[in-house]
Swiss-Prot record:
Residues forming the catalytic site: C357 (cysteine persulfide intermediate)
Reported cofactor(s): pyridoxal 5'-phosphate
Function summary: Catalyzes the removal of elemental sulfur from cysteine to produce alanine. It supplies the inorganic sulfur for iron-sulfur (Fe-S) clusters in mitosomes.
Reaction catalyzed: (sulfur carrier)-H + L-cysteine = (sulfur carrier)-SH + L-alanine
UniProt GO molecular function: cysteine desulfurase activity; iron-sulfur cluster binding; metal ion binding; pyridoxal phosphate binding
EC class (word): transferase
Name the UniProt record assigns to this protein: Cysteine desulfurase, mitosomal
One of the protein's GO biological processes: [2Fe-2S] cluster assembly
Taxonomic lineage: Eukaryota, Fungi, Fungi incertae sedis, Microsporidia, Unikaryonidae
Record carries keyword Transferase: yes
Family: Belongs to the class-V pyridoxal-phosphate-dependent aminotransferase family. NifS/IscS subfamily.
InterPro entries tied to this protein: Aminotrans_V_dom (IPR000192), Aminotrans_V_PyrdxlP_BS (IPR020578), Cys_deSase_IscS (IPR010240), Cysteine_dSase (IPR016454), PyrdxlP-dep_Trfase (IPR015424), PyrdxlP-dep_Trfase_major (IPR015421), PyrdxlP-dep_Trfase_small (IPR015422)
Annotated [2Fe-2S] cluster binding sites: C357
Amino acid sequence: MIGGLKSCIEQPSLPKPSTLLPQDKACDTGGKRIFLDVQSTTPVDPRVLDAMLPFYTTVFGNPHSRTHRYGWQAEAAVEKARSQVASLIGCDPKEIIFTSGATESNNLALKGVSGFKLKEGKAAHIITLQTEHKCILDTCRNLEENGVEVTYLPVGNDGVVDIDDVKKSIKENTVLVSIGAVNSEIGTVQPLKEIGMLCKERGVLFHTDAAQGVGKIQIDVNEMNIDLLSMCAHKIYGPKGIGALYVRRRPRVRMVPLINGGGQERGLRSGTVASPLVVGFGKAAEICSKEMKRDFEHIKELSKKLKNMFKKNIEGVIINGSEKGFPGCVNVSFPFVEGESLLMHLKDIALSSGSACTSASLEPSYVLRALGRDDELAHSSIRFGIGRFTMAKEIDIVANKTVEAVQKLREMSPLYEMVKEGIDLSKISWTS
């Protein structure tokens, strides 16, 4: 039915928003402000907005209405977008379940799988990492309160998990291993293929939170033996409020839904699918499929430039994470500088001291502490996010302003003065 409706979404009279929002204007910094916080969100690509707007005005039908043209048009558009998203990760379109975002997808994966086991009266054990996103860790803590056993594995000082630790942690009642593709704070890329192979050999489901990985690094769920994968649109230059969970069909992943209702999305996520958001997600995925390699090389070049400028001009600077991590996430510790103070000195630059979900907390980053960083170093860290629309001249501005701010703040630090005078702080006996 859907194949015969492709013509329904051909609308020659639809508005062309690109004439109102050209790409250079959409990403204009206004000459002052610079956005380097792409791990928290990304600007909507103007081509994505072009694709979305007609579905707010002309093609506004409910995609679940099967009795008239408005519904057929919306349904055809949703299914096209489902195919675009599926193509990005190498799966069947029927394996894509649309959600409100990666947080919901993660909740559905963890609670859905463990909930099915508990419903059968069986014990459930989940394995994850100490450095996972807060929505994974909080969901696991919630599951622990409901009888699910959870193992939180440590990582190395580069943020990468030891495969042997995963292997040793798998037990008879282990139902799921949940390990993120790319860490949102330090950009560490986990060995998904090796983990997936291990899980397949041991008969355990493998879930990955790929919100920071999809569209940025190559991910193929079949090659990597991934059974469940969470993603969202607003991390790949699409709209906020829409995400997806890939759920393998063969062999079938058994799970219970979080939301009951009309039985949409294979009964796993009831509720009317927001066709404008889904269309935007699909277009963003299509662009990533075509331009991922170019984006990666652009980001890699700017990342190298930023790191080199810091290393050349700031004494003792520490780049956190793995050298083989995603280059667009540059987490830097500036010893003897308070991270929050540095952010205040760089108020015209959008940066973060950690995940957007935890950056309001004054606690040092739990991710950096898991890497073995002490509280002082963790407090001195800033994340620089480089994306598709970041320009080389912006990197120059950011690097120069950061160097200047670090030098000013260090001049006010008595500890830094002591270090410059050759005093070994570790040998000082501090009194309270």
